[in-house]
Amino acid sequence: MTNIRKTHPLLKIVNHSLIDLPTPSNISAWWNFGSLLGLCLIIQILTGLFLAMHYTSDTLTAFSSVTHICRDVNYGWLIRYLHANGASMFFICLYMHVGRGIYYGSYTYLETWNIGIILLFAVMATAFMGYVLPWGQMSFWGATVITNLLSAIPYIGSTLVEWIWGGFSVDKATLTRFFAFHFILPFIIAALVMVHLLFLHETGSNNPSGIPSDSDKIPFHPYYTIKDALGFLALILLLLLLVLFSPDLLGDPDNYTPANPLNTTPHIKPEWYFLFAYAILRSIPNKLGGVLALVMSILVLAIIPLLHMSKQRSMMFRPISQILFWVLVADLLTLTWIGGQPVEHPFITIGQVASILYFTIILILMPLASLIENKILKW
């Protein structure tokens, strides 16, 4: 008798995706982040669902309802902080996952890569709208500043902003619609994840060497199920350390002050995971230029496959590209630091230099390094 997992229509899909999936035998811990992102998404949807049961999306009661969740709901504080810090873990895993894709040349799987970019935008949009919901000072002013950027779009800008706001300022209508979108988007993300995996399983996983591994595949279960389980354990440990010991470490104290349209916070800044993009936005003294640079800081990922000049797929055997990659990582950390600093003398210049360097490395230096490495191969 054939095993039910190989014949049952539903179990067959699970079997081909998680059990009998042929997987390269040499993929490293950098390949754990895909499954960790899946875990993060599940954690966020579950904690978010329980928060939505107690939250009210009204300007008068939103802040109080979050306080009520933390004080009066059973383990409400835990659910709230798991959700808030879960978002941070989500972005750590996201950036690691994208970094892995760039380093090992996974972007040559075009469909998988492009769906991944769409997923990145969707997660960023969801996180932004979620940050507005507690209706603290930083929520309100963050929403005002970021939505206002759309007014830089020629001709339709102002109309578009008022349409998104549902009025002439960020108010009740804005909060209500942001809550609606924040609730629905994770499910759209989950659907996109399925498409992402569908395209990935068409080609199979890449591996650190970048060399086709069809001749050396092993079943996903038990080898990678146990490896993923270890990753899950590490992620949950890290998340619980954050939630139980310093839940507000990554948050902003301004968000413990209820939103007040008459009082602007001195330093408006987004959550830490958007600071690099915010620094790029601020480093251009022109509104439209800044917005374009902001969008391009993520969209540049879509151009990376077109700029792949190397004869090798992975950076494993390409020392010049490796150095550039780690300089890019250092540059992104610098931008993250600058994004959290006030707009004054040394920080403005550092931000501008770091922004130029970011685009220069990706668009010019990396393709050049690839061509040099191709030449070295012939020696």
From Swiss-Prot:
Which chain regions cross the lipid bilayer? 33-53, 77-98, 113-133, 178-198, 226-246, 288-308, 320-340, 347-367
Q: Which domain of life is it from?
A: Eukaryota
Write out the residues that bind heme b b566. 97, 196
What is the protein's major site of localization?
Answer: mitochondrion
The signal peptide here is none
Record: residues binding a ubiquinone: 201
Subcellular localization, as worded in the UniProt entry = Mitochondrion inner membrane
The biological process GO terms on file are: mitochondrial electron transport, ubiquinol to cytochrome c
Describe how the cofactor binds: Binds 2 heme b groups non-covalently.
Gene3D superfamilies on file: Cytochrome Bc1 Complex, Chain C (1.20.810.10)
Topology in membrane = Multi-pass membrane protein
Question: What InterPro entries would the database entry show?
Answer: Cyt_b/b6_C, Cyt_b/b6_C_sf, Cyt_b/b6_N, Cytb/b6-like_sf, Cytochrome_b, Cytochrome_b_C_euk/bac, Cytochrome_b_N_euk/bac, Di-haem_cyt_TM
Keywords in UniProt for this one?
Electron transport, Heme, Iron, Membrane, Metal-binding, Mitochondrion, Mitochondrion inner membrane, Respiratory chain, Transmembrane, Transmembrane helix, Transport, Ubiquinone
**Similarity comment: family membership:** Belongs to the cytochrome b family.
Q: What's in the misc comment field? A: Heme 1 (or BL or b562) is low-potential and absorbs at about 562 nm, and heme 2 (or BH or b566) is high-potential and absorbs at about 566 nm.
Tell me, how does this one assemble? The cytochrome bc1 complex contains 11 subunits: 3 respiratory subunits (MT-CYB, CYC1 and UQCRFS1), 2 core proteins (UQCRC1 and UQCRC2) and 6 low-molecular weight proteins (UQCRH/QCR6, UQCRB/QCR7, UQCRQ/QCR8, UQCR10/QCR9, UQCR11/QCR10 and a cleavage product of UQCRFS1). This cytochrome bc1 complex then forms a dimer.
Return the protein name. Answer: Cytochrome b
Q: Which organism is it from?
A: Sylvilagus palustris (Marsh rabbit)
